[in-house]
Amino acid sequence: MTKPLELPVIIFISYLVLLAAGIQEGRYVKHEASYDQPISDKIINKIIETGDGDVFHCIDINLQPALSHPLLKGHIIQMEPTSYPSELKIKSSSDTIATEAHLPTIACPKGTIPLLQNSKADLKTQFSFDPIGNTHHRGGERAGCTTYDEIYGTQVAINVYEPKVRGQNDLSASWALMVNGPTGNYEGIGAGSIVWPNYHGDNFARFHIYWQVNTVNMPCFDHMCPGFVQVSKSVGIGGRIEPVSTYNGDQYEITVTISKDPKTGNWWLAYGRDKKPLGYWPPSIFTYMNEKASACFWGGQVHGPTVQLHLPELGSGHWAATGPGKAAYVRSIKVINKDSQYFIPGTHNTFSGSTRPFCYDAGDIRFNDDGARLLYGGPGNCTK
């Protein structure tokens, strides 16, 4: 089915804050107090540089940005999910032979997490767009599919490309987003691959996480503002995804899983086919996303202050009609119900579409036992 997409997303960059506090050993780590402080050499346990030049600071798990959130005072860090949704295996698609892409492994010591040193980004630059309906007049476009339901998580395999982005602070994303809330006041969480030149001074596909809460109306990425509690000591959020797909050539994908812990209520994020837990968004920071989502989007989005002057490529930079291996895809799409079970989105409440059909498109949704899938993309650089 197709209809205009109505998924809300508001994007702009915030600032980086950190806190200091105590730590205790065990599965849960309790944070007793918090106060904002600038990052300093004193809280860096180890510095690690990857082969492609990224620099990660290993900091104590209790000195991460999330715990400076005023609603997380006294928060006890949950080191792993209490349980996992059933039917986690993603099957191979008959018309897509894709290899799993990876993030660099960061060998931070036990009890620490890696934070990407982001000295090249202009963190003061901000941009946003209208979260409802057609968004081109506010600097955003999208193509993909959306389902509307009571949603407690999702799992998707995302085809990874490096689309050309012309504006330095514009971005092109391929990701999954979950939202809830009244019109004009949505909250959301998500993750996926983004090419964003101004983020780290390059045009690489990088793994980013996103969330927005209505109390501050301030969308955030990665660790730029408090909210996401990271537990992984080896996965660097914001790191480069490699390899990436080539048009009519080798195809690579990442698997993103977001699931609500049935006991703690935390929104857990896992990366890869082995579903490695990265961390979680505590429900206490949300008003509308504290219990469930009402809609979920999978596909591509472009945003930025100069998007309408120089529309970036989306996906592979080619139309969905070019077919598998040429257009980008999202596949094995599943959602999670209240009983922590996977199910395939319904044909009656799942729709594909584009906010700018002369620039980007989304193909028909295919439903099978593996989940839903579709192709999407476009060259951008159009005026209609």
Placement of each model-derived feature along the sequence:
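Exposed, interaction-prone regions of secreted/extracellular proteins
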Residues: 2-384
